[in-house]
A protein has these predicted regions:
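Short glycine-/polar-rich loops that comprise or flank the Walker A/P-loop
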Residues: 89-90, 120-123, 147-149
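Short beta-strand-loop
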Residues: 24-53, 134-143
């Protein structure tokens, strides 16, 4: 699971980096979580990222800490982008987990991030690897397509890297086009 994600991230980076429109619009950051959550890659332009930090499976799966860290990071990053005069788009988060939450308060932290009254509330597209349950992954996703289908996905270990790349490429372009290029 995590190894496939680590293998997929450089390919996704290369795909975005080769598209001048996406490269201009996208900033990427990486937050890792287990028992705690930490920013591994601060929000950066794609052209400024040389190597992705490796994700490591360890400890528990504390979703609450992940969502709290995510909200704080988005808040800081979006304010910094506003100050720099950069065109702002609603953030898009790919939430990737290889397990079920080990904390009981994660839904409250998730609700704060997903709150549509928060001006920086992100689209959350969730991706579950081998240890994650479909119902939980669906509950994490906030983004839905025009037919109301949740952008929540599951993959087994063998297919996770390919599925992650496919999902990233098929979803990110339409969301960016709708929200950033057409000014939504």
């Amino acid at each position: 699971g995590i190894d496939a994600c680590n293998a997929a991230l450089p390919n996704i980076h290369a795909a975005i980096g080769s598209d001048p429109i996406m490269n201009d619009k996208i900033r990427i950051g990486v937050i890792s979580f287990s028992d705690t959550a930490q920013v591994l890659l601060p929000l950066s332009k794609m052209t400024d990222v040389v190597d992705f930090p490796g994700l490591v499976a360890k400890g528990g799966t504390n979703y609450g800490n992940a969502f709290t860290c995510l909200k704080n990071t988005i808040q800081t990053d979006m304010v910094d982008l506003q100050k720099s005069g950069a065109k702002m788009c609603r953030p898009i988060v790919f939430f990737i987990s290889d397990g079920e939450p080990t904390d009981t308060n994660w839904k409250a932290a998730h609700a704060q991030v997903a709150d549509k009254t928060w001006p920086f509330s992100p689209h959350i597209i969730s991706f579950g690897l081998s240890g994650a349950q479909a119902d939980t992954i669906r509950e994490v996703a906030t983004q839905v397509d025009k037919k109301g289908k949740s952008f929540a996905y599951l993959a087994d270990d063998d297919a996770s890297g390919a599925v992650l790349r496919e999902i990233f490429n098929s979803l990110l372009s339409p969301i960016l086009r709708d929200e950033c290029l057409e000014g939504r």
